A protein has these predicted regions:
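Short, surface-exposed beta-strand/loop micro-motifs that present aromatic residues
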Residues: 311-320, 324
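Active-site SXXK
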Residues: 41, 69-95, 169-174, 252-255, ...
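Structural recognition of the beta-strand scaffold that forms the well-ordered cores
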Residues: 117-119, 324-327
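Short, conserved catalytic-motif segment at the N-terminal edge
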Residues: 11-70, 91-93
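Short, glycine/proline-biased beta-turn/loop segments that scaffold the active-site neighborhood
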Residues: 93-108
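Generic C-terminus detector
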Residues: 332-354
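Short, surface-exposed loop or secondary-structure junction motifs
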Residues: 42, 46-53, 108-303
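Catalytic tyrosine of NAD(P)H-dependent dehydrogenase/reductases that use a Tyr as the general acid/base
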Residues: 68-71, 159-161
Length: 354
């Protein structure tokens, strides 16, 4: 990635300091890392460190064109903007319980929750998936199970992050739009922004060859590479709102730039971004926007938002500062420990946003 111009206000570090921070952090975490920082004009700077993986992957280094399993960043890159298209066109009422206007939810516990609560993770849904264990492998049975599952707590009483909210919202978005989420995301998000490498898996041989591997899979006897790591998304065929998308730092830079400077005619720009990037949880903690999390270590009033992915991915946005940042690692390839990665993420956020 080219350093287009120096960024101001990076806590005195500058781009070379941010690069050193990520390099040292990647060695401590023990994973490859790709980072970038930008503004409404595009990428300001970036870099990459470490190796793509162990064994046969130890000869490979990550870069801005390395595909990463985005894990829960899929919620932002695919599901959230598609929900925004429907919201801005008046087809997705944010505050009416689903059961009043979406027939599949009527008479079920899921009918008690609202779209806003699903996006803010205040819907009170079960905090785990366990789809195969609870419902088997049939997709219709899983959908029925998600709709009929009892709520974990009353809607609107607590913030509790759960993939079930994204899965339920996927069903709703697909029903309203009349197409699967991968087609909607490509049509409304990735193609308009020129995100040519972003897609759902499983990836073909050529793309898989430049994809960061995730965990070793006992069933196949190999590391997952180009196949979604998240077991729920894999069970759902690889396409879900909670996980399943793959992308590169180069493409994510285009996406984050568009949040600060939406292109004319973007069907989820403007009002949807305004609505989403403000606190939506009414003083409950942790504070969240719509899909986005208020960045840990910051005051929600500062308006710095983040989303993380289980595989080791993450990105941040601050409209107040006019800046975005991304940090992609393949941490889960090595182990599931999060303490050192959390330290790196927090230090990176502080360096870029203060």
């Amino acid at each position: 990635m080219s350093h287009r111009r120096p960024a101001s206000g990076t806590d005195g570090l500058g781009m070379s300091g941010v690069d050193r921070l990520v390099g040292e952090g990647a060695r401590t975490v023990g994973a490859g890392a790709v980072w970038a920082v930008g503004d409404a004009g595009g990428t300001l700077g970036g870099g990459s460190h470490g190796l793509l993986g162990q064994g046969p992957y130890a000869r490979l280094r990550p870069g801005p064109d390395t595909l990463h399993d985005l894990a829960s960043l899929t919620k932002i890159v695919a599901l959230w903007p598609c929900a925004g298209v429907l919201w801005q066109s008046g087809r997705l009422p944010p505050d009416e319980p689903l059961g009043r206007w979406w027939p599949p939810a009527a008479g079920h516990p899921a009918g008690e929750v609202t779209v806003r609560q699903l996006l803010a993770h205040t819907a009170g849904m079960l905090p785990y998936t366990r789809f195969e264990q609870l419902y088997g492998r049939d997709l219709a049975a899983i959908r029925a199970g998600v709709l009929a599952a009892p709520l974990h707590r009353p809607p609107g009483t607590a913030v509790e992050y759960t993939d079930r909210a994204a899965v339920l919202l996927t069903y709703l978005v697909e029903d309203l739009a009349g197409a699967p989420l991968d087609e909607l995301a490509a049509r409304w998000v990735w193609e308009p922004l020129g995100m040519a490498d972003t897609r759902y898996g499983p990836l073909g041989t050529v793309l898989a060859a430049r994809t960061a591997p995730t965990e070793y899979d006992e069933r196949t006897g190999a590391h997952l590479r180009g196949v979604v790591h998240d077991p729920s998304a894999r069970l759902l065929g690889g396409v879900s709102g909670n996980a399943g998308a793959f992308s590169t730092a180069r493409d994510l830079a285009r996406f984050l730039t568009a949040l600060l400077a939406p292109p004319p005619g973007l069907p989820w720009g403007g009002a949807w971004i305004d609505e989403s990037l403000r606190e939506q949880t009414g003083g409950l903690v942790p504070a969240r926007g719509l899909s986005w999390l208020c960045a840990p270590g910051t005051d929600p009033a500062e308006g710095t938002f983040v989303h993380y992915g289980f595989t080791g991915t993450g990105f941040w946005i601050s409209r107040r500062l006019g800046r975005w940042a991304l940090l992609l690692t393949n941490k889960v390839h090595y182990d599931r420990g999060v303490a050192q990665l959390t330290e790196l993420r927090n230090a990176f956020r502080q360096a870029v946003f203060g």
